[in-house]
């Protein structure tokens, strides 16, 4: 039977991509349905209990700037907050929080259940309704059919998921959850390129069986960082330390002597694993010269005794896992409460997607998260938000939106996936962004919140706070520009006490702040430049904008030159065999990728600058040279 009410957007899957997609579509006023196999696991952290990190924290801040959920949820659930790369420049600083799994899941579910325009329904999806190469609905395992104008697939590792522990394996979406086999078969019938990837997770340890007294502690930062631009540290629950142990030669001997029982090394697993989150077997073999690896013992929550040993992801048999765990300091008597495992799953080639994450072949069908070949909660959440907002726009007959590489890490992520594809689980790093000085965590709202407001993602409260912050920044910069001190002034001695070289000429507050030894905090304790802003976010922006003004201006010039290519559009139906002068290799690659713009075409491996020049001349001759706004 058909469900009596039609929907604008259907989201299939309630993980980090699905929850952001559902919230985005509903915030934009579209009637949204979230279908999940289990309402109790909405927002579940399937692997490590943490949010953020290098590159990943940037994505979380961008999701937040666009009105998303993840940052707000972790502010309510984070039990240890730290700034990584704190001693480095602002471009690569990143926030990371250890999470209480239960509190995080509760925060996500509460937000979903109180979101207008959103209905949640518990049923696994087994089929899509496709008519004339357009998706028009979904079918659940009990045969119930739902109609919609757009469907977003956010199914994580569930598509034909296979769990491996040693040489034994069984079907599963993750430990304790069934796989989605009928939906996997249905998607394989569609004109989509499919592959297999693999990821893994470590065994979980009973904290009561660990001797923490012999281990080094790692505490969070004080003052505590905050993830959401709307958040504050008072929202954080109780904070707790993590602990550090190490593998050793005994650990490595156990692993090396049991490699024949590893499904990866025995050839049982076909899928490629994540390069930047390797299993302990991989680490021992790839870095044979190292006699130890650092392992972080991370609490899974305030009310749980489970410990997540970050760094020993493994699919070795359970008896070997026990030996590995007990070979490490402080863990000699440790007990495992959940075994580690590897999971293989289907993913679909993201080169078959538009930058909006809509399929090039099935109209109205969007893909987000691990199904696109990424790894990580943050990468999934960012894609989910983008797919959800574009599904909402499509259902409202509006043009799609995707950020440029110069606008957001989300733009880098989507461009990398849709242009280059991936042969291994893709993880975000700051090094992937060529304009990272512009794409900092601290200015994600300045880059994206105004766009989010135009798209209908940003509510009145966030918009008011954003405008207040802008006014505070502008007012403070004007104050510092117009406040001067001269070498002969009474205040000069007070100022000189904080400078490596005394004043030799008149200087404004901004001139002083540009000096490497001066900080905004220090400057605003000096009589001529007091008091400091009480708005800490605005104060941070003032300091960064002043200190890095020259570098930022230079990077902005580079971006403007590059935008000319980014905005030169290529027709989706263009057959590149028509373009005389292109090599057969270039023709094949362009016809295979179908790039959306000259900028995207230029990043395809093998497409040379000469080929781009030929293409531009041909487009001009044909009267097809057009640029987007």
UniProtKB/Swiss-Prot annotation:
The keyword NAD applies. One of its GO terms (biological process) is tRNA wobble uridine modification. Belongs to the MnmG family. Its cofactor is FAD. Homodimer. Heterotetramer of two MnmE and two MnmG subunits. FAD binds at residues 13-18, 125, 180, 370. It is found in: Cytoplasm. This is tRNA uridine 5-carboxymethylaminomethyl modification enzyme MnmG. GO terms for molecular function: flavin adenine dinucleotide binding. NAD(+) binds at residues 273-287. It comes from Escherichia coli O1:K1 / APEC.
